[in-house]
UniProtKB/Swiss-Prot annotation:
Gene: UBC2
Gene3D superfamilies xref list: Ubiquitin Conjugating Enzyme
Source organism of the structure: Fusarium solani (Filamentous fungus)
Protein name: Ubiquitin-conjugating enzyme E2 2
Chemical reaction(s) catalysed: S-ubiquitinyl-[E1 ubiquitin-activating enzyme]-L-cysteine + [E2 ubiquitin-conjugating enzyme]-L-cysteine = [E1 ubiquitin-activating enzyme]-L-cysteine + S-ubiquitinyl-[E2 ubiquitin-conjugating enzyme]-L-cysteine
Transmembrane regions: none
Length: 151
């Protein structure tokens, strides 16, 4: 069945193949364009550098009018990531726009890694360490980077 959401997701997929943003990749799972597997590489010169973080993106038929649900599969220690892997990111909630595509979502998440919003933490411990003890925060992040290589 070809719906507007599915057509849009196929366009997003073609764009990811022909003009991939640096450090992110994504593609639909076999036989289901509404579920995507994605990978974000930790940005250079950040505690997340060289990490390979896996995510799953779940789209509904209302896409692009409704944002996807995005969740880290890889362990993540970050102020804006819940223990479940779900993200607290404004563009996935109240600041969503139908102009955003898969690439925009993933690059926004990649940017969030080194620029967390500590005013709205999903992980209070990570937020407090980020603000008050950057050395320990960096150590904990580096531990998740090393675990990401094992996934």
């Amino acid at each position: 069945m070809s719906t507007a959401a599915r057509r849009r997701l196929m366009r997003d997929f073609k764009r990811m193949q022909t003009d991939p943003p640096a450090g992110v990749s994504a593609s639909p799972v076999p036989d289901n364009v509404m579920t995507w597997n994605a990978v974000i590489i930790g940005p250079a010169d950040t505690p997340f550098e060289d990490g390979t973080f896996r995510l799953v993106m779940q789209f509904e038929e209302q896409y692009p009018n409704k944002p996807p649900q995005v969740k880290f599969i890889s362990e993540m220690f970050h102020p804006n990531v819940y223990a479940t892997g779900e993200l607290c990111l404004d563009i996935l909630q109240n600041r969503w726009s139908p102009t955003y595509d898969v690439a925009a979502v993933l690059t926004s998440i990649q940017s969030l890694l080194n620029d967390p919003n500590t005013g709205s933490p999903a992980n209070v411990e990570a937020s407090n360490l980020y603000k008050d003890n950057r050395k320990e925060y960096t150590k904990r992040v580096r531990e998740t980077v090393e675990k990401s290589w094992e996934d």
